[in-house]
């Protein structure tokens, strides 16, 4: 996969860094994750946690302070606190907001712990994938912020002095996508969000692309 991406990057003149993120929910067995981390170092491999227990596992396994840790899933105060404490210890960790109340909790906990959090926002795109799981992405998804909610989040960040903390935008167009055209459409839409956010003074550094190509497992 990495060699294919490298070839495509050369063909289309893509110059930016790219990172591979492994969600440990796929397989949490320590020997498996350690092997993936070891092999993936040269490919900028990071890990994704979808819960507080998974984040505990990621912190314990991943000793590389340069690799990315992405925090998704439902976030209560204890999950957010663990992520922020890990950041204070030098971990390169990002909390991806899926609901407005999560953003307010992050701001509250960050103030208590005296840390400037690395914040990501999951955006609901109008575009969606295709196939069996298309409703898990796009504006039909129950996860992520709509355009109006995104504006509310941006106003909130600015009011709390956290404008510079928005480092990442995330979108998910669904699993088992059967039409490459849907992915292209979603990427164009996401790039517009990226450009507009920069124009508004939010210096987003990462675009986290979620979803997967259709694979015939039968």
Where are these regions (language model features)?
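Low-complexity, highly charged intrinsically disordered N-terminal segments
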Residues: 1-13, 23
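A short, charged/proline- and glycine-enriched loop
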Residues: 15-17
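Active-site-proximal beta-alpha core segment in soluble small-molecule metabolic enzymes
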Residues: 19-206, 215
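Structured binding elements
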Residues: 209
């Amino acid at each position: 996969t990495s060699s294919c991406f490298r070839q495509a990057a050369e063909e289309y003149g893509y110059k930016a860094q790219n990172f591979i993120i492994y969600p440990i929910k796929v397989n949490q067995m320590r020997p498996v994750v350690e092997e993936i981390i070891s092999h993936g170092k040269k490919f900028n491999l990071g890990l994704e946690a979808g819960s507080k227990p998974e984040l505990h596992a990621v912190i314990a396994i991943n000793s590389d302070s340069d690799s990315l840790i992405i925090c998704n899933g439902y976030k209560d105060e204890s999950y957010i606190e663990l992520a922020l404490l890990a950041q204070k210890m030098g971990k390169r960790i990002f909390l991806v907001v899926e609901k407005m109340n999560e953003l307010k909790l992050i701001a509250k906990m960050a103030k208590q712990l005296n840390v400037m959090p690395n914040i990501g926002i999951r955006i609901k795109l109008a575009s969606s994938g295709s196939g069996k799981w298309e409703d898990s992405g796009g504006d039909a998804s129950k996860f992520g912020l709509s355009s109006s909610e995104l504006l509310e989040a941006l106003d909130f960040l600015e009011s709390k002095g956290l404008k510079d903390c928005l480092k990442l935008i995330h979108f998910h167009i669904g699993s088992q996508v059967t039409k490459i055209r849907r992915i292209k459409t979603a990427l164009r839409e996401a790039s517009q969000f990226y450009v507009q956010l920069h124009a508004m003074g939010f210096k987003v550094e990462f675009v986290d692309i979620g979803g997967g190509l259709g694979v015939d497992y039968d």
